[in-house]
């Protein structure tokens, strides 16, 4: 596979942003060998997996800490990993000169990737996955823009009720960050960061959704289980899976990214 790390000045982030990408390259051995001119000039469009990193991480973590490049190579797909800082994939309108991470993905990065690279823009061939804070981003994008994705996977996270800040430290942290981004809790409730409300509103339009966690993860009882109960009580279709003994860790996420690719029909070629 080809690995690209590129920086470009974003209109929505008001700064340069680093994006890591994995792209199919010329098969060099076996029956998949092809002529370079034929391969690169074929005009073929490949499925895209959008991968959102967690808090205190960056766009390089999935490259450095998992075998995602190998798994993408086996399936001949494009993987896109943007850098979101600690934004919770929200629009921070009062930060610096504005840091509109939520809009950046759908309004800037997706058009860039779909038009500059051999990436399919067909929603049925675009999938999104993220761990921890990235899971909040996944839920937010799929709930508010179900028309853009063929599936979404939330790893090691649950989506809290914005009125539930007294549940515990982890829940309060998510709600606090989303409130800060919007300039207040009521403002957060009125926009795309009210993820549960968006899920209820668009529950008949949602693509296939998946959510998993390790039972030793501190998010398990405080965030994951209440979120699972919420989906069941509101008729929101989502597949849930728990892994005994795993914590908040890359060993689990490396296993899960393979399972998710298969779940979304991105099979080994």
Annotate the PLM regions.
Residues 1-269:
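Non-catalytic cap/lid and distal C-terminal segments of serine-dependent acyl enzymes
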């Amino acid at each position: 596979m080809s690995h690209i790390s590129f920086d470009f000045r974003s209109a929505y982030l008001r700064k340069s942003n680093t994006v890591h990408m994995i792209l199919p390259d010329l098969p060099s051995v076996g029956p998949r060998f092809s002529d370079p001119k034929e391969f690169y000039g074929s005009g073929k469009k490949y499925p895209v997996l959008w991968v959102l990193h967690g808090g205190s991480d960056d766009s390089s973590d999935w490259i450095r800490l998992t075998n995602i490049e190998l798994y993408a190579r086996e399936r001949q797909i494009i993987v896109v990993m943007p850098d979101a800082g600690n934004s919770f994939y929200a629009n921070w309108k009062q930060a610096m000169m504005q840091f509109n991470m939520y809009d950046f993905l759908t309004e800037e990065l997706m058009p860039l990737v779909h038009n500059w690279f051999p990436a399919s823009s067909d929603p049925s061939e675009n999938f999104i996955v993220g761990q921890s804070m990235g899971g909040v981003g996944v839920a937010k994008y799929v709930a508010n823009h179900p028309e853009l994705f063929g599936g979404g996977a939330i790893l090691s996270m649950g989506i809290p009720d914005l009125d539930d800040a007294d549940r515990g430290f982890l829940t309060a942290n998510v709600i606090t960050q989303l409130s800060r981004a919007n300039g207040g809790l009521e403002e957060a409730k009125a926009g795309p960061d009210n993820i549960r409300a968006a899920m209820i509103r668009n529950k008949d339009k949602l693509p296939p959704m998946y959510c998993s966690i390790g039972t030793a993860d501190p998010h398990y009882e405080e965030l994951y289980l209440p979120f699972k109960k919420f989906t069941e009580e509101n008729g929101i279709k989502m597949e849930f899976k728990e892994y005994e003994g795993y914590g908040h860790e890359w060993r689990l996420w490396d296993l899960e990214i393979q399972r998710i690719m298969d779940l979304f029909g991105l099979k080994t070629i």
